[in-house]
């Protein structure tokens, strides 16, 4: 992944309005339009563009975040040959309709329903952290740091973490040898 226009996408995000409760997924109902749209975007990237650099898929309404590891989508959706066949038929115009709503209601809904109880994800609500912003104690800071780490590019793009406490700082080591 790099920062050019032609580079592969590493993160897919579907953002819903806070007032659009009918389309936003919930812990009780994952099979809603937000996840159906994520599935379509994922299949377009993975099947059509051969992009295997996707790391996470996120559905959010700015307060609630549902973060899916791309490995879950790979196992539950991409490896499902029947779904890939139906998706390709949809893309190639061999289905009754080529409208995205058709994909959501006739294809995505069926396959999400099959895996919704076993689909793993991380969930949190930013409003649950609001009260921590005014506190100055270390436990509040730790919780906010954990949240910050989730949103970091290192985490979201699964970049290697360079600050290993067991590794030597090359500049410090060279200076130490010089002394």
Regions found by a protein language model. Name each.
Residues 1-179:
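Charged, often flexible domain-edge or linker segments that flank or initiate folded functional domains
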């Amino acid at each position: 992944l790099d920062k050019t226009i032609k580079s592969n996408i590493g993160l897919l995000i579907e953002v819903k309005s806070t007032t659009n409760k009918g389309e936003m997924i919930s812990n009780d109902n994952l099979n809603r339009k937000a996840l159906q749209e994520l599935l379509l975007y994922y299949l377009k990237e993975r099947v059509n563009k051969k992009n295997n650099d996707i790391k996470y898929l996120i559905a959010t309404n700015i307060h609630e975040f549902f973060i899916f590891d791309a490995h879950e989508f790979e196992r539950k959706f991409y490896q499902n040959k029947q779904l890939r066949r139906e998706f390709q038929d949809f893309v190639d115009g061999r289905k009754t309709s080529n409208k995205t709503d058709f994909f959501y209601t006739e294809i995505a809904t069926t396959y999400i329903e099959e895996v919704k109880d076993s689909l793993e994800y991380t969930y949190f609500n930013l409003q649950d952290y609001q009260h921590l912003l005014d506190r100055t104690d270390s436990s509040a800071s730790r919780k906010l740091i954990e949240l910050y780490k989730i949103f970091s590019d290192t985490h979201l793009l699964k970049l290697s973490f360079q600050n290993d406490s067991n590794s030597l700082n090359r500049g410090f080591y060279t200076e130490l040898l010089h002394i």
